[in-house]
Curated annotation (Swiss-Prot):
InterPro entries attached to this UniProt entry: ASFV_MGF360 (IPR002595)
Species annotation: African swine fever virus (isolate Tick/Malawi/Lil 20-1/1983) (ASFV)
This protein's record includes keyword Transport: no
Keywords, alphabetical: Early protein
Name of the protein this chain belongs to: Protein MGF 360-8L
Signal peptide region: none
Keyword Ribonucleoprotein: no
BP-aspect Gene Ontology terms: taxis
Superkingdom, natural source: Viruses
Upregulation: Expressed in the early phase of the viral replicative cycle.
Similarity section: Belongs to the asfivirus MGF 360 family.
Purpose: Plays a role in virus cell tropism, and may be required for efficient virus replication in macrophages.
C-alpha cells in the first residue's frame, strides 16, 4: 500500500503548478532533469519537457532506468514507489551505492544481455523498445556487448534487410534494429522517440517505412520532407519484400518506374508484388478490369490502406 506521502506527491505531480511555486516542488522531491516532475492523469507515464522532448510521454519504467543511470537516488525511490519496475535496475546501476539501492528495492541479480533483449522484445510495444534502448545505450557495464548473441532474433525480424544495419559498433546495430522494429510494428511513440533522439537516422527511417510497408510513416516523412530518396530507389526497396502493396502503390503515384518495379520483384522472386505491379501497369494504361478497382493518384495513407486492405492482384486471381 502506498504511503500518504507517496500518494500526496503523486497527486501534486498530476497538477499544473505555476512557476513561482516550483521551489516547493524542488523541496518535496518532485524535480528531475531541471524540470518539475509531471505525471499523466490517466496513465503511468511521465510528461517530459526537456530540450530534446517537448511534452513527450515516457513510461515510468523507462524514466526509472534513466534515473538509475544518473545515480539519482531520490528519484529512483520516488518512481519505484509510484509503481515503476526495478527488475532491470542492476543492469544499469553504475556505482555500488546505486546497486545496493536497487537490490533493496527489488532489482533482479544475474540477468544476462540476451535474457533482457529477448525478454523485453517478446511483446513489441513502444515502452518495451524504448526501455530496451535505455538499458543498453550508453551503459559502460555492457561494453563487452556481443551482437552475435542477438543475431538470430534480429535476422528473424529483419530478414534480408539485416544487411543494411551491419556495423562494427554493436550499439549502432541495435539502435537501427529498435528503430526498424518500431516502424515495422507501427509503434508511434517509439518512432517519435527515435526520431527526436537520432536525427542523423532520418534516411534509415525512410528506408524502414518503405521496406516494412508502413504507408502512414512514409507519407509523414514525404509530406514533412524529413528525408529524400530517388523515387525509383524507393520503388526498388518496396519491391524487395512481398505484399508491400501500399508502399509500392505510393511510389507508383509519385512517379516510380513500374516496369523497373516488375523486374525488381521478379529478381527477388516476390510473386505477389509481380502481380500487383502488373495491375498498376494496367491501371496506368487504363486497361485494368479487377474488382475492386485500383484508383489512380491517391496519396492519403488512410485511403490507400482502405483500398488495398483486402486487395488481390488480378494476375494472381487468374492463375
Amino acid at each position: 500500500m502506498l504511503s500518504l506521502q507517496t500518494l500526496a506527491k503523486k497527486a501534486v505531480a498530476k497538477q499544473s503548478v505555476p512557476e513561482e511555486y516550483h521551489y516547493i516542488l524542488k523541496y518535496c522531491g518532485l524535480w528531475w532533469q531541471n524540470k518539475p516532475i509531471s505525471l499523466c492523469h490517466y496513465c503511468n507515464y511521465i510528461i517530459l519537457n526537456s530540450t530534446l522532448f517537448k511534452r513527450e510521454l515516457l513510461h515510468l519504467d523507462v524514466a526509472l532506468i534513466m534515473a538509475i543511470k544518473e545515480n539519482n537516488y531520490d528519484v529512483i525511490r520516488l518512481f519505484t514507489e509510484w509503481g515503476a519496475n526495478i527488475y532491470y535496475g542492476l543492469t544499469c546501476a553504475r556505482t555500488e551505492q546505486t546497486q545496493e539501492l536497487c537490490r533493496e528495492l527489488g532489482a533482479k541479480d544475474g540477468l544476462n544481455n540476451k535474457e533482457i533483449f529477448i525478454g523485453l522484445l517478446r511483446h513489441k510495444t513502444s515502452n518495451n523498445i524504448i526501455l530496451c534502448h535505455e538499458i543498453f545505450n550508453n551503459n559502460p557495464i555492457l561494453e563487452t556487448l556481443n551482437i552475435q548473441d542477438f543475431g538470430e532474433e534480429i535476422h528473424r525480424e529483419l530478414k534480408f534487410f539485416i544487411f543494411y544495419i551491419l556495423d562494427n559498433v554493436p550499439i549502432n546495430v541495435l539502435v537501427k534494429y529498435w528503430y526498424a522494429i518500431a516502424i515495422k510494428y507501427k509503434l508511434k511513440r517509439a518512432i517519435s522517440f527515435f526520431y527526436q533522439t537520432y536525427g542523423h537516422l532520418n534516411m534509415w527511417r525512410l528506408m524502414c517505412a518503405i521496406y516494412f510497408n508502413n504507408i502512414f510513416d512514409l507519407h509523414e516523412i514525404y509530406e514533412q520532407k524529413i528525408a529524400h530518396m530517388d523515387i525509383d530507389e524507393m520503388m526498388q526497396l518496396a519491391c524487395m519484400r512481398d505484399y508491400n502493396f501500399s508502399t509500392i502503390y505510393y511510389c507508383f503515384v509519385l512517379g516510380g518506374d513500374i516496369d523497373q518495379a516488375i523486374n525488381v520483384s521478379q529478381w527477388h522472386h516476390q510473386t505477389n508484388n509481380i502481380c500487383f505491379c502488373k495491375d498498376l501497369k494496367d491501371l496506368k494504361q487504363n486497361v485494368l478490369t479487377a474488382r475492386p478497382l485500383l484508383l489512380p493518384n491517391i496519396t492519403d495513407p488512410k485511403k490507400i490502406y482502405t483500398m488495398l486492405k483486402n486487395y488481390l492482384p488480378t494476375s494472381s486471381n487468374s492463375r
